Regions:
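Bacterial signal peptide processing site
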Residues: 28-31
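N-terminal helical cap/lid subdomain that shapes the substrate entry/recognition surface
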Residues: 118
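N-terminal propeptides/low-complexity segments immediately following signal peptides
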Residues: 35-47
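Bacterial N-terminal signal peptides that target proteins for export
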Residues: 2-16
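C-terminal motif of bacterial Sec signal peptides marking the signal peptidase cleavage site
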Residues: 23-26
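Alpha-helical cap/lid subdomain in secreted, periplasmic
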Residues: 103, 121-259
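Hydrophobic helical h-region of N-terminal Sec-dependent signal peptides
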Residues: 17-21
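Serine-esterase "nucleophile elbow" of acetyl-processing enzymes
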Residues: 45-113, 123-131
Length: 259
């Protein structure tokens, strides 16, 4: 049992409904109230798409300069950075970290609060208007919080990968491990956890460690909702992801003639 899982179980033992906290916050407070907010958030997060497309086109033209690869972070409110300024969200932090270590990238935040994997499978086609060299997929948390079928989540995530390969066959793809809270029982939690390794094997994509490892269940690293990381927690998320992403980012094509 991981430290994160133990903390989630301790919260549940104290009478705190982890699932309810997750549903109220990670799912964008639910229902119709969040729909307009989610749409606005998506537009805000993707406001740089046109600029990215123009920059990518410029980078693709013959030049003596080094091309800057585009990394698309596609996910939920955890990717969007709900409750944080855009520059505090982990995609922006990773962009800064990559540049500081000599591997400049252009990070595009494609996070959307409250989105299930079914929504992700529908939205990915639109998001892929952004030319990307690498797509980082974070999805499934909202499925788990609602107790939705792990098999359905698996199929939806596989569809996301299939769409990326169809629309942008040159893009590299990585999948991020997500976990379910313990409220639905050990069988559901186990079945949900295993879909990610299954997808990674079937689709031959790298599987990154649990997004919130070392952050989930630790109050000082999360916002008041107890779910979404605060700036300190977000820095840990970014550090953890970068450890896995760095060797992949280092191999991205920076040839000015590509793109």
């Amino acid at each position: 049992m991981t430290r994160t899982t133990r903390r989630l179980r301790e919260c549940a033992d104290r009478g705190v409904s982890v699932a309810i906290l997750f549903v109220l916050s990670a799912c964008g407070s639910g229902g119709n109230v969040s729909n307009s907010r989610n749409v606005a958030e998506a537009k805000n997060n993707m406001s740089g798409v046109k600029a990215t497309e123009d920059s990518a086109a410029t980078a693709a033209a013959p030049s003596t300069s080094v091309r800057t690869p585009v990394v698309l972070f596609f996910g939920t409110s955890l990717t969007a950075g709900l409750g944080l300024d855009p520059e505090q969200a982990f995609p922006s932090l990773i962009e800064k970290r990559a540049k500081a270590e000599g591997f400049p990238i252009r990070a595009v935040n494609g996070g959307l609060s409250g989105e299930t994997t079914a929504g992700a499978a529908r939205r990915i086609d639109w998001v892929l208007r952004t030319p990307a060299d690498l797509v980082v997929i974070e999805g499934g948390a909202n499925d788990a919080l609602r107790g939705l079928s792990p098999d359905a989540a698996r199929a939806n995530l596989e569809q996301v990968i299939a769409t990326i390969r169809q629309k942008q066959p040159r893009a590299k793809i990585v999948l991020v491990q997500m976990e379910a809270p313990p409220n639905y029982g050990p069988t559901y939690t186990r079945n949900f956890r295993t879909i990610y390794a299954d997808i990674a094997r079937k689709e031959n994509v790298p599987l990154l460690p649990f997004l919130l490892d070392g952050v989930a269940g630790i109050s000082r690293l999360n916002q008041a909702d107890g779910v979404h990381p605060n700036p300190a927690g977000e820095r840990i998320v970014a550090d953890n992801l970068w450890k896995s992403l760095k060797p992949i980012v280092a191999q991205l094509d920076r040839n000015p003639g590509s793109g």
